[in-house]
Amino acid sequence: MELTFLGTSAGVPTRTRNMTSIILNLQQPTRAEMWLFDCGEGTQHQFLHTPYHPGKLNKIFITHLHGDHLFGLPGLLCSRSMQGNSLPLTLYGPKGLKEFVETALRLSGSWTDYPLTIIEVGPGLVFDEEGYRVTAYPLSHPVECYGYRIEQHDKPGTLDAAQLIADGVPPGPLFHQLKRGQRVTLEDGRVIDGSRYLGPATPGKTLAIFGDTAPCPQALEMARGADVMVHETTLEQAMAEKANSRGHSSSQQTAALAKEAGVGTLIATHFSSRYDAEGCLKMLAECREIFANTLLAEDFMVYKMA
């Protein structure tokens, strides 16, 4: 699991920070997948500065319908079509996403030449398939807003092939079934339980990507035990009251959540345009006073989940 931050600004862009968008590059059991979280204005332009291409996207998750998280979506969808891409794309987001996309395409005389599916989510399970479970959590913001918790399925333990051969199981297609912990029947009638030949499973990674939010109980539930938490840090601690009144979080409120939830790493992002590089570093220092393992997201920063 690898994150690439395409935009880390809140509200409006700055000279060094674009609007919110994050690529999640996944290595699936049978194929690679690429997901996008939010699509602020200029996202497709940010792609040009990365090794990735919008045509390779499989899924796009929108946290809420505020423009700084959404206004880059129609252009990206149309460009993807103009480039002759036929890979199906699924959009996930709150109620109103389908109407927004269909209206933008209709009024601009645009269309997509690839299968486009739009799924409006509610609180709870979004899907559990192909190695990953995604759950949407409602957050505290002036409009309907969600965070997404991505849980990687545990990886099966190593198959003890040497022991299987020693027990008279011939190498071949049966090993694939045994690797999944299944039972197989040999030609001689013996039943072999694959789980007995597997080493310990490797726990999957958990990633929590938040939309905009003021502190709320659901945030703790969403973040609990995550290996990585990506969370907005819109304003410095001295402006916490102002941040909360607008459905946002301050630096130390975000850090306190990371600490209470027991996350491994906090990546702070979504900084107000009032802050230059020095101002963002000040907020990073405020976060680290409470939660030491905090990173400051920057446009085009890449973070690999080990």
Swiss-Prot record:
Keywords: Endonuclease, Exonuclease, Hydrolase, Metal-binding, Nuclease, tRNA processing, Zinc
Gene3D superfamilies cross-referenced by the UniProt entry: Ribonuclease Z/Hydroxyacylglutathione hydrolase-like (3.60.15.10)
CDD domains for the chain: RNaseZ_ZiPD-like_MBL-fold (cd07717)
NCBIfam families assigned: PRK00055.1-1, PRK00055.1-3, RNase_Z
Gene Ontology MF, one: 3'-tRNA processing endoribonuclease activity
Cofactor mode of binding and number, as noted: Binds 2 Zn(2+) ions.
Annotated protein name in UniProt: Ribonuclease BN
Source species: Klebsiella pneumoniae (strain 342)
Needed co-factor(s): Zn(2+)
Function noted in UniProt: Zinc phosphodiesterase, which has both exoribonuclease and endoribonuclease activities.
PANTHER family linked to this entry: ZINC PHOSPHODIESTERASE ELAC PROTEIN 1
Enzyme type, top EC level: hydrolase
Stored InterPro entries: Metallo-B-lactamas, RibonucZ/Hydroxyglut_hydro, RNase_Z/BN
